[in-house]
Amino acid sequence: MSINGFLIAAPQSGSGKTTISLAIMAALRRRGLVVAPFKCGPDFIDPGYHRMASGRASINLDGWMCPESFVAETFRLHAEAADVAVIEAVMGLFDGLGASPLQGSSAQIAAICGAPVVLVVNARGMAASAAALVKGFAEFDPDVRLAGVIFNNVGSAGHAELLARVMASALPEIALLGCIPRDEALAIPSRHLGLVTAEDNPLPPEYLDRLADLAEKHLDLAGLAGLRITPRSVGASLSRTNGGGMLPVRIAVARDAAFCFVYQDNLRLLREAGGELLFFSPLADGALPEGISGIYLPGGYPELYAERLAVNVPMLDAIRGAARDGMPLYAECGGFIYLTRGMEDSQGAPLADFAGIFPVRARMLPKRKALGYRQVECLSVSILGPAGETARGHEFHYSEICEMPVDVTRTYSVTRQGAFLGQEGYCLSNCLASYVHLHFGSNPCLAPSLVAACRKFAATRRS
């Protein structure tokens, strides 16, 4: 099946690729096209904005967390259901974080997916030098196909004409797909890894309309929408499971402004393993969904909603009761904090009381505590699988756990690029909590193991 689409990249962060990606998504959607949005890397923030611009959930594509076969499979699965796929890059096009120079880079994703690259170049103060920069990117990696360029921060119509002449003369094989004029009012507030979330700072319809108008006026939208994906073979896809034909098992998944950081493929893989996902709000709901046999608490920013979470005592009681009954409960980062006794400031003064399943408090810090990719090895059996399994994910937080008791099982050995960071993945009964956001695509046993644990609990409860 043929797929139209492209990857929007840049030489470096701050070039305007997110704003331009949103403008293209909004404009193509307004033209009646179904847009499938994607984001390179582990970021949860830009996908929230993608959803607002495109009307569809954005999918993370990460070549470090997930095998290439999984990346190719999930891209094809989501892109085939749309008219055009728009992939937003992360950092500079060739900037990776893995052991090899390009692993984890947007260039790797472009190569895996066979996506042509559209390079967004900040042309402020440049003319012929801009073409030289584009030429370097076009020739750097033969596995990456640079199909077009968009110049951003163009100072005037004359500047745009000069850039067009230079490109036509020096690089006629690379399409000039538009010149975006300088407009500081179009910038999105600082949002890197969540300083501002899409839920906290939703894009107003009039802002999206302005972006769509900008794209209509200054970009070759037909040329962009006509770019074709060239599928490449990257090995066998990961095997899937549908739960062995058994009836679905209900799993409650927290989803609101406080708990909005989740990889969409985690939810898909849980469904494919036989999970029936029921969403609930720890902020607004007074009870858990009926008939559930498991709970998934994703990450987010509970510290921004601490008081509202703390006063929702019926929900806290329901979470405590589920844990007491032995229901499988998996929590990541913000979800983990929600399961502690509560939060305190950097001086130890209490801020809010939470579920108290783990006998410890989370302390907020003035500076970032952790950021980066993580690999975990399971030291013991848990609701995510047997001992010896490995998985990959990402960690980002401004809090720390204050002296977790030694009798609480540490399920994970955590490393960063091979360097040992410590043991966590705290386990009490059937509750597993960690600061690491695991991508279930990194290991095909994770989602089926969690669903199997929920199914086992359901069977025990029936008996």
From Swiss-Prot:
It holds the Pfam family GATase_3. Pathway: Cofactor biosynthesis; adenosylcobalamin biosynthesis; cob(II)yrinate a,c-diamide from sirohydrochlorin (anaerobic route): step 10/10. It catalyses: cob(II)yrinate + 2 L-glutamine + 2 ATP + 2 H2O = cob(II)yrinate a,c diamide + 2 L-glutamate + 2 ADP + 2 phosphate + 2 H(+). GO terms for biological process: cobalamin biosynthetic process. Residues 250-445 form the GATase cobBQ-type domain. Keywords: ATP-binding, Cobalamin biosynthesis, Glutamine amidotransferase, Ligase, Magnesium, Nucleotide-binding. The record marks H437 as: Increases nucleophilicity of active site Cys. The keyword Ribonucleoprotein does not apply. GO terms for molecular function: ATP binding; cobyrinic acid a,c-diamide synthase activity. SUPFAM superfamilies: Class I glutamine amidotransferase-like (SSF52317), P-loop containing nucleoside triphosphate hydrolases (SSF52540). The a and c carboxylates of cobyrinate are activated for nucleophilic attack via formation of a phosphorylated intermediate by ATP. CbiA catalyzes first the amidation of the c-carboxylate, and then that of the a-carboxylate. Comprises of two domains. The C-terminal domain contains the binding site for glutamine and catalyzes the hydrolysis of this substrate to glutamate and ammonia. The N-terminal domain is anticipated to bind ATP and cobyrinate and catalyzes the ultimate synthesis of the diamide product. The ammonia produced via the glutaminase domain is probably translocated to the adjacent domain via a molecular tunnel, where it reacts with an activated intermediate. HAMAP family: CobB_CbiA (MF_00027). This is Cobyrinate a,c-diamide synthase. It comes from Pelobacter propionicus (strain DSM 2379 / NBRC 103807 / OttBd1). The lineage of its organism: Bacteria, Pseudomonadati, Thermodesulfobacteriota, Desulfuromonadia, Desulfuromonadales.
